[in-house]
Amino acid sequence: MEQEENHSADHLSAQPGNGNELEESSVKERCFEQREALVGEPRCVICGRYGEYICDQTDDDICSVECKTILLSKLSAETRPVVKAAKRVNLPVGDESFCIRDENFPKIPSMHDGQIASLRSKLDICVKGEDVPDPIMCFSSSGLPEKLVLNLEAAGYVMPTPVQMQVIPSSICNRSLLVSADTGSGKTASFLVPIIAHCSHVRSERCTDKQGPLAIVLAPTRELCLQVEEQAKVLGKGLPFKTALVVGGDPLAQQIYRIENGIELIVGTPGRLIDLLMKHNVDLNKVDVFVLDEVDCLLERGFRDQVMQIFQALSHPQVMMFSATVNSEVEKMSNSLAKNAIHISCGNPSRPNKSVKQVVIWVESKQKKQKIFEIMTSKQHFKPPAVVFVSSRIGADLLSEAITVATGLKVVSIHGDKTMNERRESLRRFLTGEVSVVVCTGVLGRGMDLLKVRQVILFDMPNSIDEYVHQVGRASRMGVEGMAIVFVNEEDRNLFRELVQILKTAGAPIPRELANSKYTTGIPLGGGKKRKLKSR
Protein backbone atom coordinates (compact mmCIF):
# COMPACT_ATOMS: atom_id res chain seq x y z
CA MET A 1 0.00 0.00 0.00
CA GLU A 2 1.14 3.54 -0.68
CA GLN A 3 0.55 4.47 2.94
CA GLU A 4 2.82 1.67 4.12
CA GLU A 5 5.54 2.64 1.62
CA ASN A 6 5.65 6.19 2.91
CA HIS A 7 5.19 5.18 6.55
CA SER A 8 8.83 5.27 7.59
CA ALA A 9 9.90 8.26 5.54
CA ASP A 10 7.02 10.55 6.49
CA HIS A 11 6.44 9.73 10.13
CA LEU A 12 9.79 8.78 11.64
CA SER A 13 12.22 11.46 12.77
CA ALA A 14 15.82 10.30 13.13
CA GLN A 15 19.35 11.52 13.51
CA PRO A 16 20.67 11.88 9.93
CA GLY A 17 24.09 10.66 8.96
CA ASN A 18 25.41 13.14 6.36
CA GLY A 19 22.54 15.52 5.84
CA ASN A 20 19.22 16.81 7.03
CA GLU A 21 17.03 14.23 5.30
CA LEU A 22 16.71 10.58 6.25
CA GLU A 23 17.15 8.11 3.41
CA GLU A 24 14.20 5.73 3.29
CA SER A 25 16.49 2.71 2.95
CA SER A 26 18.20 3.50 6.27
CA VAL A 27 15.04 3.16 8.36
CA LYS A 28 14.97 -0.01 10.46
CA GLU A 29 11.82 -1.90 9.49
CA ARG A 30 11.98 -4.62 12.14
CA CYS A 31 12.78 -4.47 15.84
CA PHE A 32 15.54 -7.11 15.67
CA GLU A 33 17.46 -4.98 13.14
CA GLN A 34 18.08 -2.30 15.78
CA ARG A 35 21.01 -2.44 18.21
CA GLU A 36 20.78 -2.30 21.99
CA ALA A 37 20.76 1.16 23.62
CA LEU A 38 23.93 2.46 25.23
CA VAL A 39 24.01 4.29 28.56
CA GLY A 40 22.34 7.69 28.24
CA GLU A 41 20.80 6.97 24.83
CA PRO A 42 17.02 7.10 24.26
CA ARG A 43 15.24 3.75 24.47
CA CYS A 44 12.34 2.46 22.43
CA VAL A 45 9.13 2.67 24.47
CA ILE A 46 8.03 -0.72 23.12
CA CYS A 47 11.10 -3.00 23.23
CA GLY A 48 13.82 -1.00 25.01
CA ARG A 49 16.31 -1.05 22.12
CA TYR A 50 18.04 2.11 20.84
CA GLY A 51 15.34 4.72 20.19
CA GLU A 52 16.83 6.01 16.94
CA TYR A 53 13.60 7.57 15.77
CA ILE A 54 10.78 9.70 17.17
CA CYS A 55 7.16 8.85 16.45
CA ASP A 56 5.68 12.12 15.18
CA GLN A 57 2.17 11.25 16.37
CA THR A 58 3.15 10.62 20.01
CA ASP A 59 6.64 12.16 20.41
CA ASP A 60 7.87 8.85 21.88
CA ASP A 61 11.25 7.25 21.13
CA ILE A 62 11.03 4.14 18.93
CA CYS A 63 13.54 1.79 17.28
CA SER A 64 11.80 0.71 14.07
CA VAL A 65 8.69 0.82 11.90
CA GLU A 66 7.53 -2.38 13.60
CA CYS A 67 7.55 -0.82 17.07
CA LYS A 68 5.93 2.35 15.73
CA THR A 69 3.05 0.28 14.38
CA ILE A 70 2.64 -1.46 17.73
CA LEU A 71 2.73 1.89 19.56
CA LEU A 72 0.07 3.45 17.34
CA SER A 73 -2.10 0.34 17.63
CA LYS A 74 -1.99 0.61 21.42
CA LEU A 75 -2.74 4.32 21.24
CA SER A 76 -5.67 3.70 18.91
CA ALA A 77 -7.13 1.09 21.25
CA GLU A 78 -6.78 3.36 24.28
CA THR A 79 -8.24 6.46 22.66
CA ARG A 80 -10.85 5.02 20.29
CA PRO A 81 -13.85 6.75 21.97
CA VAL A 82 -12.03 10.08 21.91
CA VAL A 83 -11.16 9.67 18.23
CA LYS A 84 -14.82 9.13 17.34
CA ALA A 85 -15.87 12.27 19.17
CA ALA A 86 -13.09 14.29 17.54
CA LYS A 87 -14.68 13.87 14.08
CA ARG A 88 -16.93 16.82 14.94
CA VAL A 89 -13.99 19.10 14.18
CA ASN A 90 -14.75 18.65 10.48
CA LEU A 91 -18.16 20.34 10.85
CA PRO A 92 -18.54 24.05 9.96
CA VAL A 93 -18.73 24.94 13.64
CA GLY A 94 -15.22 25.62 14.99
CA ASP A 95 -13.71 23.64 17.84
CA GLU A 96 -13.86 26.20 20.61
CA SER A 97 -12.04 24.00 23.09
CA PHE A 98 -8.81 25.63 21.89
CA CYS A 99 -10.10 29.19 21.65
CA ILE A 100 -8.56 31.71 24.03
CA ARG A 101 -9.39 35.35 23.45
CA ASP A 102 -8.74 38.43 25.54
CA GLU A 103 -12.32 39.64 25.39
CA ASN A 104 -13.88 36.43 26.72
CA PHE A 105 -11.32 35.67 29.39
CA PRO A 106 -13.32 34.69 32.49
CA LYS A 107 -13.04 36.84 35.57
CA ILE A 108 -13.63 35.62 39.11
CA PRO A 109 -17.39 36.28 39.23
CA SER A 110 -17.92 36.55 42.97
CA MET A 111 -14.99 38.81 43.88
CA HIS A 112 -14.81 42.60 43.67
CA ASP A 113 -11.62 44.68 43.54
CA GLY A 114 -11.22 44.75 47.31
CA GLN A 115 -11.47 40.98 47.56
CA ILE A 116 -8.97 40.53 44.73
CA ALA A 117 -6.52 42.80 46.56
CA SER A 118 -7.10 40.86 49.77
CA LEU A 119 -6.48 37.55 47.99
CA ARG A 120 -3.21 38.81 46.52
CA SER A 121 -2.13 40.05 49.93
CA LYS A 122 -2.85 36.72 51.61
CA LEU A 123 -0.98 34.82 48.90
CA ASP A 124 1.92 37.29 48.99
CA ILE A 125 1.35 38.28 45.35
CA CYS A 126 2.50 41.78 44.38
CA VAL A 127 1.71 43.23 40.95
CA LYS A 128 2.77 46.43 39.24
CA GLY A 129 1.42 47.61 35.90
CA GLU A 130 -1.67 48.81 34.10
CA ASP A 131 -4.85 46.73 33.78
CA VAL A 132 -3.41 43.65 35.46
CA PRO A 133 -5.73 40.65 34.91
CA ASP A 134 -7.36 39.10 37.96
CA PRO A 135 -5.81 35.91 39.36
CA ILE A 136 -7.47 32.59 38.64
CA MET A 137 -8.55 30.15 41.33
CA CYS A 138 -8.50 26.96 39.23
CA PHE A 139 -7.11 25.88 35.86
CA SER A 140 -10.52 25.06 34.42
CA SER A 141 -11.67 28.69 34.80
CA SER A 142 -8.94 30.08 32.55
CA GLY A 143 -10.22 29.05 29.13
CA LEU A 144 -7.60 26.34 28.64
CA PRO A 145 -8.11 23.35 26.31
CA GLU A 146 -9.88 20.56 28.17
CA LYS A 147 -7.07 18.12 27.33
CA LEU A 148 -4.50 20.49 28.85
CA VAL A 149 -6.51 20.70 32.08
CA LEU A 150 -6.64 16.89 32.19
CA ASN A 151 -2.88 16.73 31.61
CA LEU A 152 -2.33 19.15 34.49
CA GLU A 153 -4.44 16.99 36.80
CA ALA A 154 -2.60 13.84 35.70
CA ALA A 155 0.72 15.56 36.41
CA GLY A 156 -0.37 16.35 39.96
CA TYR A 157 -1.39 20.00 39.58
CA VAL A 158 -4.55 19.99 41.71
CA MET A 159 -4.83 23.78 41.84
CA PRO A 160 -2.62 26.67 40.71
CA THR A 161 0.19 27.91 42.94
CA PRO A 162 0.19 31.67 43.68
CA VAL A 163 2.60 32.46 40.84
CA GLN A 164 0.50 30.37 38.43
CA MET A 165 -2.70 32.09 39.59
CA GLN A 166 -1.38 35.45 38.42
CA VAL A 167 0.98 34.58 35.55
CA ILE A 168 -1.34 32.31 33.54
CA PRO A 169 -4.19 34.83 33.07
CA SER A 170 -1.72 37.66 32.44
CA SER A 171 0.07 35.62 29.78
CA ILE A 172 -3.15 34.45 28.13
CA CYS A 173 -4.12 38.11 27.81
CA ASN A 174 -0.92 38.57 25.76
CA ARG A 175 0.87 40.74 28.33
CA SER A 176 4.64 40.85 28.63
CA LEU A 177 5.84 39.91 32.12
CA LEU A 178 8.74 40.16 34.54
CA VAL A 179 8.16 37.54 37.22
CA SER A 180 10.06 36.86 40.42
CA ALA A 181 9.01 34.10 42.79
CA ASP A 182 10.32 31.79 45.48
CA THR A 183 12.40 28.85 44.39
CA GLY A 184 10.12 25.84 43.89
CA SER A 185 6.96 27.91 43.40
CA GLY A 186 5.93 26.46 40.03
CA LYS A 187 7.33 29.08 37.65
CA THR A 188 7.97 26.59 34.84
CA ALA A 189 4.36 25.46 34.55
CA SER A 190 3.21 29.08 34.78
CA PHE A 191 4.75 29.86 31.39
CA LEU A 192 4.35 26.42 29.77
CA VAL A 193 0.59 26.29 30.31
CA PRO A 194 -0.21 29.47 28.32
CA ILE A 195 2.37 28.53 25.66
CA ILE A 196 0.76 25.13 25.10
CA ALA A 197 -2.72 26.66 25.08
CA HIS A 198 -1.65 29.28 22.52
CA CYS A 199 0.11 26.77 20.25
CA SER A 200 -2.85 24.38 20.39
CA HIS A 201 -5.23 27.17 19.45
CA VAL A 202 -3.11 28.31 16.50
CA ARG A 203 -2.55 24.81 15.15
CA SER A 204 -6.21 23.86 15.50
CA GLU A 205 -7.13 26.78 13.25
CA ARG A 206 -4.27 26.31 10.74
CA CYS A 207 -3.36 22.63 10.81
CA THR A 208 -0.60 21.97 8.24
CA ASP A 209 2.58 19.92 8.41
CA LYS A 210 6.11 21.20 8.94
CA GLN A 211 5.32 24.61 10.38
CA GLY A 212 7.88 26.84 12.06
CA PRO A 213 8.04 27.35 15.83
CA LEU A 214 5.53 29.54 17.64
CA ALA A 215 7.44 29.96 20.92
CA ILE A 216 11.02 29.96 22.23
CA VAL A 217 12.18 29.32 25.80
CA LEU A 218 15.79 30.14 26.68
CA ALA A 219 17.46 28.85 29.85
CA PRO A 220 21.07 29.06 31.11
CA THR A 221 21.89 25.34 31.47
CA ARG A 222 21.41 22.16 29.48
CA GLU A 223 19.85 20.39 32.45
CA LEU A 224 17.24 23.09 32.94
CA CYS A 225 16.41 23.07 29.21
CA LEU A 226 16.05 19.30 29.29
CA GLN A 227 13.67 19.50 32.22
CA VAL A 228 11.58 22.30 30.71
CA GLU A 229 11.18 20.32 27.50
CA GLU A 230 10.25 17.14 29.36
CA GLN A 231 7.60 19.01 31.35
CA ALA A 232 6.30 20.60 28.14
CA LYS A 233 5.89 17.14 26.61
CA VAL A 234 3.96 15.90 29.63
CA LEU A 235 1.58 18.87 29.67
CA GLY A 236 1.18 18.93 25.88
CA LYS A 237 0.45 15.21 25.48
CA GLY A 238 -2.40 14.58 23.05
CA LEU A 239 -2.47 18.19 21.80
CA PRO A 240 -1.13 19.61 18.51
CA PHE A 241 2.11 20.51 20.26
CA LYS A 242 5.67 19.32 19.54
CA THR A 243 8.99 20.46 20.95
CA ALA A 244 12.66 20.64 19.96
CA LEU A 245 15.54 20.64 22.45
CA VAL A 246 18.46 22.79 21.24
CA VAL A 247 21.43 22.35 23.58
CA GLY A 248 25.11 21.48 23.35
CA GLY A 249 26.05 17.85 23.74
CA ASP A 250 23.33 16.55 21.43
CA PRO A 251 23.88 16.23 17.63
CA LEU A 252 23.05 19.51 15.88
CA ALA A 253 21.85 17.67 12.76
CA GLN A 254 19.22 15.83 14.79
CA GLN A 255 17.97 19.10 16.27
CA ILE A 256 17.74 20.69 12.80
CA TYR A 257 15.88 17.69 11.43
CA ARG A 258 13.41 17.89 14.29
CA ILE A 259 12.70 21.58 13.67
CA GLU A 260 12.39 21.19 9.90
CA ASN A 261 9.73 18.51 10.37
CA GLY A 262 7.49 20.93 12.24
CA ILE A 263 7.43 21.89 15.90
CA GLU A 264 5.69 24.47 18.08
CA LEU A 265 8.24 25.13 20.84
CA ILE A 266 12.03 25.46 20.89
CA VAL A 267 13.71 25.04 24.28
CA GLY A 268 17.42 25.78 24.31
CA THR A 269 20.49 27.57 25.54
CA PRO A 270 21.32 30.90 23.85
CA GLY A 271 24.73 29.81 22.54
CA ARG A 272 23.50 26.65 20.88
CA LEU A 273 20.46 28.36 19.37
CA ILE A 274 22.65 31.12 17.91
CA ASP A 275 24.92 28.45 16.44
CA LEU A 276 21.93 26.74 14.87
CA LEU A 277 20.48 29.96 13.47
CA MET A 278 23.82 31.00 11.96
CA LYS A 279 24.33 27.70 10.13
CA HIS A 280 20.78 26.87 9.07
CA ASN A 281 17.72 28.70 7.81
CA VAL A 282 15.14 28.39 10.57
CA ASP A 283 11.87 30.27 10.08
CA LEU A 284 11.23 32.39 13.19
CA ASN A 285 8.61 34.64 11.58
CA LYS A 286 5.74 33.04 13.48
CA VAL A 287 7.40 33.08 16.92
CA ASP A 288 5.15 35.27 19.06
CA VAL A 289 6.11 34.09 22.57
CA PHE A 290 9.65 34.57 23.89
CA VAL A 291 10.49 33.29 27.39
CA LEU A 292 13.68 33.81 29.40
CA ASP A 293 13.95 31.44 32.36
CA GLU A 294 16.39 32.32 35.17
CA VAL A 295 17.17 35.74 33.68
CA ASP A 296 19.66 36.66 36.39
CA CYS A 297 21.67 33.51 35.72
CA LEU A 298 21.60 34.16 31.96
CA LEU A 299 23.10 37.58 32.61
CA GLU A 300 25.68 36.29 35.08
CA ARG A 301 26.88 33.79 32.48
CA GLY A 302 27.32 36.53 29.87
CA PHE A 303 24.41 35.62 27.60
CA ARG A 304 22.96 39.14 27.31
CA ASP A 305 24.24 39.84 23.78
CA GLN A 306 23.16 36.43 22.52
CA VAL A 307 19.69 36.85 24.01
CA MET A 308 19.35 40.26 22.35
CA GLN A 309 20.54 38.82 19.03
CA ILE A 310 17.83 36.15 19.13
CA PHE A 311 15.19 38.67 20.24
CA GLN A 312 16.03 41.00 17.34
CA ALA A 313 15.37 38.15 14.90
CA LEU A 314 11.76 37.98 16.13
CA SER A 315 8.82 40.16 15.18
CA HIS A 316 7.40 41.87 18.29
CA PRO A 317 6.83 38.78 20.43
CA GLN A 318 5.17 38.61 23.82
CA VAL A 319 8.08 38.49 26.30
CA MET A 320 8.02 36.66 29.62
CA MET A 321 11.03 36.83 31.96
CA PHE A 322 11.37 34.67 35.07
CA SER A 323 13.89 34.81 37.86
CA ALA A 324 14.22 33.91 41.52
CA THR A 325 15.94 37.26 42.11
CA VAL A 326 15.49 40.62 40.38
CA ASN A 327 18.33 43.14 40.39
CA SER A 328 19.09 46.27 38.38
CA GLU A 329 20.59 44.28 35.49
CA VAL A 330 17.47 42.15 35.22
CA GLU A 331 15.26 45.25 35.22
CA LYS A 332 17.47 46.82 32.56
CA MET A 333 17.07 43.72 30.41
CA SER A 334 13.31 43.82 30.95
CA ASN A 335 13.12 47.42 29.78
CA SER A 336 15.13 46.54 26.67
CA LEU A 337 12.87 43.66 25.66
CA ALA A 338 9.38 44.73 26.67
CA LYS A 339 7.66 48.04 27.25
CA ASN A 340 4.85 48.27 29.80
CA ALA A 341 5.53 44.80 31.15
CA ILE A 342 3.58 43.65 34.20
CA HIS A 343 5.83 43.04 37.20
CA ILE A 344 4.71 40.07 39.31
CA SER A 345 6.37 39.09 42.56
CA CYS A 346 5.34 36.11 44.69
CA GLY A 347 6.81 35.54 48.13
CA ASN A 348 10.25 36.94 48.91
CA PRO A 349 12.55 35.78 46.11
CA SER A 350 15.61 37.23 47.85
CA ARG A 351 15.12 34.91 50.83
CA PRO A 352 15.08 31.10 50.95
CA ASN A 353 11.75 29.32 50.67
CA LYS A 354 9.84 29.49 53.97
CA SER A 355 9.25 25.75 53.75
CA VAL A 356 12.98 25.02 54.07
CA LYS A 357 14.46 24.53 57.55
CA GLN A 358 18.03 25.87 57.53
CA VAL A 359 20.57 24.13 59.77
CA VAL A 360 23.95 25.86 59.71
CA ILE A 361 26.91 23.98 61.19
CA TRP A 362 30.38 25.42 61.82
CA VAL A 363 32.78 22.85 60.32
CA GLU A 364 36.46 23.34 59.58
CA SER A 365 37.44 22.35 56.04
CA LYS A 366 39.44 19.29 57.12
CA GLN A 367 36.47 17.95 59.08
CA LYS A 368 33.81 18.35 56.37
CA LYS A 369 34.08 14.83 54.95
CA GLN A 370 33.81 13.21 58.36
CA LYS A 371 30.80 15.38 59.19
CA ILE A 372 28.93 14.47 56.00
CA PHE A 373 29.70 10.78 56.59
CA GLU A 374 28.16 11.10 60.07
CA ILE A 375 25.04 12.74 58.65
CA MET A 376 24.57 10.15 55.93
CA THR A 377 24.92 7.21 58.32
CA SER A 378 22.41 8.70 60.76
CA LYS A 379 18.80 7.55 60.39
CA GLN A 380 17.75 10.65 62.31
CA HIS A 381 19.53 13.23 60.17
CA PHE A 382 19.78 11.70 56.68
CA LYS A 383 16.60 12.08 54.60
CA PRO A 384 17.25 10.80 51.05
CA PRO A 385 17.06 11.55 48.22
CA ALA A 386 19.57 14.34 48.87
CA VAL A 387 21.56 16.85 46.84
CA VAL A 388 25.08 17.82 47.94
CA PHE A 389 26.54 21.04 46.54
CA VAL A 390 30.31 21.51 46.17
CA SER A 391 32.41 24.29 44.67
CA SER A 392 34.50 22.37 42.11
CA ARG A 393 34.02 19.74 39.45
CA ILE A 394 36.85 17.51 40.64
CA GLY A 395 35.53 17.94 44.17
CA ALA A 396 32.17 16.54 43.05
CA ASP A 397 33.78 13.38 41.67
CA LEU A 398 36.06 12.85 44.67
CA LEU A 399 33.33 13.43 47.26
CA SER A 400 30.83 11.15 45.50
CA GLU A 401 33.41 8.34 45.50
CA ALA A 402 34.30 8.99 49.15
CA ILE A 403 30.64 8.87 50.26
CA THR A 404 30.12 5.58 48.44
CA VAL A 405 33.20 4.02 50.08
CA ALA A 406 32.42 5.34 53.57
CA THR A 407 28.66 4.75 53.68
CA GLY A 408 27.83 2.21 50.98
CA LEU A 409 25.25 4.57 49.48
CA LYS A 410 24.72 4.78 45.73
CA VAL A 411 26.00 8.21 44.69
CA VAL A 412 26.47 9.98 41.34
CA SER A 413 28.15 13.27 40.47
CA ILE A 414 26.99 15.90 37.97
CA HIS A 415 29.05 18.83 36.68
CA GLY A 416 30.06 20.68 33.52
CA ASP A 417 32.91 18.32 32.56
CA LYS A 418 30.47 15.44 32.12
CA THR A 419 29.04 14.78 28.67
CA MET A 420 25.38 15.55 28.07
CA ASN A 421 24.53 11.84 27.99
CA GLU A 422 26.40 11.23 31.26
CA ARG A 423 24.62 14.11 32.98
CA ARG A 424 21.24 13.04 31.61
CA GLU A 425 21.73 9.44 32.72
CA SER A 426 22.93 10.46 36.21
CA LEU A 427 19.95 12.77 36.64
CA ARG A 428 17.58 10.04 35.43
CA ARG A 429 19.00 7.53 37.92
CA PHE A 430 18.64 10.06 40.73
CA LEU A 431 15.10 11.11 39.87
CA THR A 432 13.94 7.50 39.47
CA GLY A 433 15.41 6.48 42.84
CA GLU A 434 18.21 4.24 41.58
CA VAL A 435 20.68 6.37 43.54
CA SER A 436 19.95 8.27 46.75
CA VAL A 437 22.55 11.06 46.58
CA VAL A 438 23.79 13.36 43.84
CA VAL A 439 26.92 15.47 44.39
CA CYS A 440 27.04 18.44 42.04
CA THR A 441 28.32 21.90 41.36
CA GLY A 442 25.85 24.78 40.97
CA VAL A 443 24.50 23.16 37.79
CA LEU A 444 21.47 21.85 39.72
CA GLY A 445 21.07 25.00 41.78
CA ARG A 446 18.83 26.77 39.30
CA GLY A 447 15.28 26.06 38.28
CA MET A 448 15.40 22.27 38.38
CA ASP A 449 12.21 20.63 39.65
CA LEU A 450 13.75 18.00 41.91
CA LEU A 451 10.32 17.08 43.20
CA LYS A 452 11.31 14.25 45.52
CA VAL A 453 14.26 16.03 47.14
CA ARG A 454 13.67 17.04 50.74
CA GLN A 455 17.28 17.47 51.88
CA VAL A 456 20.12 19.59 50.56
CA ILE A 457 23.64 19.74 51.98
CA LEU A 458 25.87 22.70 51.15
CA PHE A 459 29.26 21.03 51.58
CA ASP A 460 30.88 24.20 50.18
CA MET A 461 29.24 27.60 50.51
CA PRO A 462 28.57 29.27 47.12
CA ASN A 463 30.20 32.54 46.08
CA SER A 464 27.12 34.72 46.53
CA ILE A 465 24.10 34.90 48.79
CA ASP A 466 21.83 34.71 45.72
CA GLU A 467 23.29 31.31 44.87
CA TYR A 468 22.81 30.31 48.51
CA VAL A 469 19.10 31.12 48.17
CA HIS A 470 18.84 29.03 45.01
CA GLN A 471 20.70 26.02 46.39
CA VAL A 472 18.85 25.98 49.71
CA GLY A 473 15.60 26.22 47.75
CA ARG A 474 16.24 22.83 46.13
CA ALA A 475 15.06 21.24 49.42
CA SER A 476 11.44 22.26 48.85
CA ARG A 477 9.11 22.23 45.88
CA MET A 478 5.54 23.51 45.83
CA GLY A 479 5.50 24.34 49.55
CA VAL A 480 6.49 20.89 50.86
CA GLU A 481 8.77 21.07 53.91
CA GLY A 482 12.47 20.30 53.46
CA MET A 483 15.82 20.73 55.20
CA ALA A 484 19.07 22.39 54.16
CA ILE A 485 22.24 21.55 56.10
CA VAL A 486 24.95 24.15 55.55
CA PHE A 487 28.66 23.84 56.38
CA VAL A 488 30.41 27.15 57.10
CA ASN A 489 33.80 28.24 58.40
CA GLU A 490 36.18 31.19 58.23
CA GLU A 491 36.72 30.68 54.49
CA ASP A 492 33.15 31.88 53.88
CA ARG A 493 33.59 35.15 55.79
CA ASN A 494 32.55 37.36 52.86
CA LEU A 495 28.99 36.02 53.21
CA PHE A 496 28.75 36.05 57.00
CA ARG A 497 26.78 39.27 57.41
CA GLU A 498 24.16 38.50 54.74
CA LEU A 499 23.91 34.88 55.90
CA VAL A 500 23.24 35.94 59.49
CA GLN A 501 20.48 38.30 58.34
CA ILE A 502 18.82 35.48 56.38
CA LEU A 503 19.04 33.12 59.34
CA LYS A 504 17.60 35.74 61.70
CA THR A 505 14.71 36.41 59.33
CA ALA A 506 13.97 32.68 59.12
CA GLY A 507 14.29 32.19 62.88
CA ALA A 508 17.05 29.63 62.32
CA PRO A 509 19.76 28.93 64.94
CA ILE A 510 23.09 30.70 64.37
CA PRO A 511 26.32 28.90 65.35
CA ARG A 512 28.24 30.67 68.10
CA GLU A 513 31.37 30.95 65.92
CA LEU A 514 29.37 32.65 63.18
CA ALA A 515 27.52 35.01 65.51
CA ASN A 516 30.72 36.11 67.26
CA SER A 517 32.91 36.42 64.18
CA LYS A 518 34.46 39.84 63.56
CA TYR A 519 33.21 39.55 59.98
CA THR A 520 29.65 39.37 61.29
CA THR A 521 29.77 42.13 63.89
CA GLY A 522 31.26 45.59 63.76
CA ILE A 523 33.31 45.45 60.58
CA PRO A 524 31.63 46.32 57.27
CA LEU A 525 32.08 44.04 54.29
CA GLY A 526 34.51 45.30 51.70
CA GLY A 527 38.02 44.95 50.35
CA GLY A 528 40.96 43.87 52.46
CA LYS A 529 42.48 47.37 52.52
CA LYS A 530 39.36 48.90 54.04
CA ARG A 531 39.29 46.33 56.83
CA LYS A 532 42.99 46.95 57.50
CA LEU A 533 42.54 50.70 57.82
CA LYS A 534 39.52 50.22 60.07
CA SER A 535 41.42 47.93 62.43
CA ARG A 536 44.13 50.52 62.91
UniProtKB/Swiss-Prot annotation:
InterPro entries: DEAD/DEAH_box_helicase_dom, Helicase_ATP-bd, Helicase_C-like, P-loop_NTPase, RNA_helicase_DEAD_Q_motif, Znf_HIT. It comes from the Eukaryota. Keywords: ATP-binding, Helicase, Hydrolase, Metal-binding, Nucleotide-binding, RNA-binding, Zinc, Zinc-finger. Residues 1-10 have a biased composition (Basic and acidic residues). The Q motif is unique to and characteristic of the DEAD box family of RNA helicases and controls ATP binding and hydrolysis. Gene3D superfamilies: 3.30.60.220, P-loop containing nucleotide triphosphate hydrolases. Pfam families: DEAD, Helicase_C, zf-HIT. ATP binds at residues 181-188. The keyword Ribonucleoprotein does not apply. A motif (DEAD box) lies at residues 293-296. It comes from Oryza sativa subsp. japonica (Rice). Residues 168-344 form the Helicase ATP-binding domain. SMART domains: DEXDc, HELICc. It catalyses: ATP + H2O = ADP + phosphate + H(+). The keyword Zinc-finger applies. The lineage of its organism: Eukaryota, Viridiplantae, Streptophyta, Embryophyta, Tracheophyta. Belongs to the DEAD box helicase family. DDX59 subfamily. Its EC number is 3.6.4.13. This is DEAD-box ATP-dependent RNA helicase 41. A zinc finger (HIT-type) spans 40-69. GO terms for molecular function: ATP binding; ATP hydrolysis activity; mRNA binding; RNA helicase activity; zinc ion binding. A motif (Q motif) lies at residues 137-165. SUPFAM superfamilies: P-loop containing nucleoside triphosphate hydrolases (SSF52540). Residues 355-518 form the Helicase C-terminal domain. Residues 1-25 are annotated as: Disordered.
